[in-house]
UniProtKB/Swiss-Prot annotation:
Origin species: Bacillus cytotoxicus (strain DSM 22905 / CIP 110041 / 391-98 / NVH 391-98)
GO biological process: DNA repair; organic phosphonate catabolic process
Protein name per its UniProtKB record: Phosphonoacetaldehyde hydrolase
Catalytic activity: phosphonoacetaldehyde + H2O = acetaldehyde + phosphate + H(+)
Keywords on record: Hydrolase, Magnesium, Metal-binding, Schiff base
Positions that bind Mg(2+): 9, 11, 183
Gene3D superfamilies: HAD superfamily/HAD-like, Putative phosphatase, domain 2
Positions annotated as active site in the UniProt record: 9, 50
Cofactor mode of binding and number, as noted: Binds 1 Mg(2+) ion per subunit.
InterPro entries per UniProt: HAD-like_hydrolase_sf, HAD-like_sf, HAD-SF_hydro_IA, HAD_2, HAD_sf, PGP-like_dom2, Phosphonoacetald_hydro
Keyword Hydrolase included in the entry's annotation: yes
Any one Gene Ontology cellular component term annotated for this protein: cytosol
Length: 264
């Protein structure tokens, strides 16, 4: 079986090591309202369309309780819309600083293309946000063949529509000839819902949530323990394979191409 296309996520997978661009902004918009949320809470819905991410945060029991304590009522859809507008304003100002390709990505993409494999992409960012990220990433040497944002389809992750749109534009079918690579739970669900081979990447991921310096300085045993937690989350969410870095992807694809069975 031949893999004909790989569909990459963006932040935390191919650019923005650790997926830090949106994290601080999510925390800030709640802090501005007197509601403190943790980095772990802020990361939990990562990969969703960003307004859905804000909405998911307001639906978390602890955050809802804290909001009610501060405001005397539960958060409303109007609150979600107001926070999202603030989120966008702040994020747009910092996005250009968070589009650096993660180590190994450009080399792997070059190799995949040499094997005749097309490169697509999906994201939780809007089209307007991706205009910034994609432009900056291209200037630094990374540009997929196609990009789909949640704006382009009826719904973002975990729905499979962005992957289907990639398949149509790249002219690849059936879906078992495509691989989805991402760094969040919603990426894994997106890939599986689309009927694709699905691969989670640990280092640089939002799920791991560490900077490169933190990874380099962390005690090896402690790092391995944290990586194992992420590995299990990916597998439980549907990943067929989990890799530590992008450099392992070609080997995984070679292994997949030797398989004769149809994924389910």
């Amino acid at each position: 079986m031949k893999i004909e296309a790989v569909i990459f996520d963006w932040a935390g997978t191919t650019v923005d090591y650790g997926c830090f661009a949106p994290l601080e902004v999510f925390m800030e918009i709640f802090k501005n309202r007197g509601v403190m949320i943790t980095a772990e809470e802020a990361r939990r819905p990562m990969g969703l369309l960003k307004i859905d991410h804000v909405r998911a945060l307001t639906e978390m029991p602890r955050i809802r309780g804290e909001w009610e304590r501060v405001f005397g009522q539960l958060p409303t859809e109007a609150d979600v819309q107001e926070m999202y507008e603030e989120f966008e304003e702040i994020l747009f100002s910092i996005l250009p600083r968070y589009a650096t390709p993660i180590s190994g990505v450009k080399e792997v993409v070059t190799y995949l293309r040499s094997q005749g494999i097309k490169i697509g992409s999906t994201t939780g960012y809007t089209r307007e946000m991706m205009d910034i990220v994609a432009r900056e990433a291209k200037a630094q040497g990374y540009e997929p063949d196609y990009l789909v944002t949640p704006d382009d389809v009826p719904a973002g992750r975990p729905y499979p529509w962005m992957c289907y749109q990639n398949a149509m534009q790249l002219n690849v079918y059936p879906m078992k000839h495509m691989v989805k690579v991402g760094d969040t739970i919603s990426d894994m669900k997106e890939g599986r819902n689309a009927g694709m081979w699905t691969v989670g990447v640990i280092l640089g991921s939002s799920e791991l949530g560490l900077t490169e310096k933190e990874v380099e300085s962390m005690d090896l045993v402690a790092l391995q323990e944290r990586m194992e937690v992420v590995r299990k989350r990916f597998i439980e969410s549907g990943a067929h394979y989990v890799i530590e870095t992008m450099k392992e992807l070609p080997q995984v694809i070679e292994y997949i191409e030797k398989q004769e069975f149809i994924i389910s």
